[in-house]
A protein has these predicted regions:
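Secondary-structure boundary motif
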Residues: 2-3, 69, 147, 151
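Short, intrinsically disordered low-complexity segments
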Residues: 22, 60-61, 180, 184
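C-terminal subregions of glycosyltransferases and related glycan-biosynthesis enzymes
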Residues: 46-48, 74-75, 100-190
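Acceptor/aglycone-binding surface of glycosyltransferases and processive sugar-polymer synthases
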Residues: 18-35, 48-49
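Conserved donor NDP-sugar-binding/catalytic core segment of glycosyltransferases
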Residues: 1-25
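Phenylalanine-focused residue identity feature
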Residues: 11-14, 28, 42-43, 53, ...
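Conserved nucleotide-sugar donor-binding catalytic segment
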Residues: 34-114
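Proteins with a high burden of low-complexity, intrinsically disordered sequence enriched in S/T/G/P/A and R
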Residues: 1-8, 56, 182-190
Length: 190
């Protein structure tokens, strides 16, 4: 994180505890079925499946400076910051569990209450549109990233983002464009 000119994010796995501090599981990444790339190609997988949690990451000053002006419409701040690092700098994953994260009924995100009757009813009532809506939301992140960092993007990165932007309006073409960019079964949009 000490590199000053390159935006950098380091994140780790974590274990979970409940509202009373009782350990509820081992690796969160394993229990949640997260597919975190080991090859360093974080952007396409982050776009498909947000797997960076702010509670288990650190950023350097350069990434902080880039991230202070969060645009309206971002999906989650921690994922936005991770996408920024993946596009403009470096992302590093530590597979060890560096913290214990508390999940409780008041969490804004996470799995607490996901199996309650109300949550199951909400999921059923949303029906099949959920996957399409999530894909559209994640593709909108591409437009926001491209606008936010237009002057900083290398030409090849801008071309990749432009292709993904076009995919927003393409139905099956969107799937094809995503697969060409490395977003497929290993990081299927969910």
């Amino acid at each position: 994180l000490r590199e000053t000119d390159v935006p950098k994010l380091v994140f780790s796995d974590f274990s979970t505890i409940d509202g009373d501090g009782v350990r509820t599981g081992g690796s969160y990444a394993a229990s949640a079925g997260l597919r975190i790339p080991q090859d360093g190609d974080f952007f396409p997988k982050l776009l498909a499946q947000p797997y960076v949690f702010g509670c288990a990451c650190g950023i350097n000053r350069r990434l902080l400076e880039l991230s202070l002006d969060l645009p309206d419409g971002i999906e989650m701040y921690d994922c936005w910051i991770a996408l920024t690092a993946a596009l403009l700098g470096k992302v590093e994953y530590l597979p060890e569990q560096t913290i214990q994260h508390r999940f409780h009924s008041s969490n804004a995100t996470g799995r607490a209450g996901q199996n309650s009757f109300l949550m199951r009813l909400k999921r059923v009532s949303r029906g099949f549109g959920t996957q399409r809506e999530n894909t559209a939301l994640r593709l909108r992140q591409v437009t926001l990233l491209r606008r936010q960092y237009a002057e900083l993007l290398p030409p090849e990165t801008d071309a990749m983002l432009a292709a993904l932007e076009r995919a927003q309006h393409g139905g099956p073409a969107a799937v094809s464009a995503l697969k060409k960019r490395g977003v497929g079964r290993g990081g299927a949009m969910q």
